[in-house]
Every structure is written in C-alpha cells, then in structure tokens.
Amino acid sequence: MRRDERQIQEGMKTRISCCSTQDVTVLHCAPMFDVILYQPEIPPNTGNIIRLCANTSARLHLVKPLGFTLEDKQLLRAGLDYHEFATITVHEGWAECEERFKGRRLFAVSTKGTQRYDQVGYTSDDVFVFGPESRGLPAEILGSVATQQCIRVPMVPGSRSLNLSNAVAVVLYEVWRQSGFSQKV
C-alpha cells in the first residue's frame, strides 16, 4: 500500500500540489468545490470521480461504509494516475460528514430532486452530495435539505438514473462553468 492510500484510509486528506514547469505541466489549483459520495458501492465509479475531482480541483468526501477498499484494482485503474492529485477525505458516517459542512449550502443530487441542476446559481462554497448507485440518497438526507437544494439532472421519461460518475461530472462542470472556469483551463 502506498503512503497516500494509508493516509486516506486513516481519514486524513492528501493533496499533492505541483506547479507548471517549462517542460511539464501538472495539476495545481486551489480546491474549489466539495463533492460527497454517500456510501458509494462501485469502485470504477469512484475511481472515475477521483479523476474528475483532480481535473476540476474539487475535494472528494467518501462516507462509510464503502462498497470496496481504497486499494481495489478497479478503483485504482479507473482513476489512472490521478489519485495523487485528488483531495480525498473518508468520513466514518453521515453525522461526521454533515458536521464538517455545517453552515455551508448543501445540495442533494437525486432523481427525486425538484429543481433542475442547471437552474440554480452556485458558489465555490457549495457542497454536493450523491447517493449510492443502487438506491440513491436516503430519506434522512433528502429531508435535511431545503426543497430548492434537492436538484436533479433531467432524463427522458421512463429512465431510472444516470451512472453516478456521469451525474457527478454533469453537475460539477455546471458549477465550474458558472464560476467562469475560475482556474486556468
């Protein structure tokens, strides 16, 4: 196990910041947004989201229990070599995670959302929580969020849900777009 994986498992954050050089340009941005995956189940989805967060300078929060270990081969493969550029925090449960974001605007992303994700004005201080792939966010979390902060990504009638990593990408890029893609692109 690599050192940064041990730190993540122990609930610590790991952030490797690098800068541009004449020969090589690597990722470096101040973290902008926070994404929470509540009890994620499928390792490749989380791996893709790790890569997405590294590329958009978003912080990723995972709420236990997880449906995999952080050494899972599929998770590591999907994230390619971006794991070292992501800021990841593992929370023991929802109460701990919720406390961490007390006082900030929390958006629950759900097929049950009443507000379309693209009809909301976002700030870099906003937090976005996504539920597990097989069942979505529990009523406890949905009920704790103001109705206008329960957002959805539209789909054609009869569709059940989007892939988790796709839904995170759609929402995160809208949030970043609204900020004017505030980091260098």
What do the predicted segments below correspond to?
Residues 2-185:
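Post-transcriptional modification and biogenesis factors for structured RNAs
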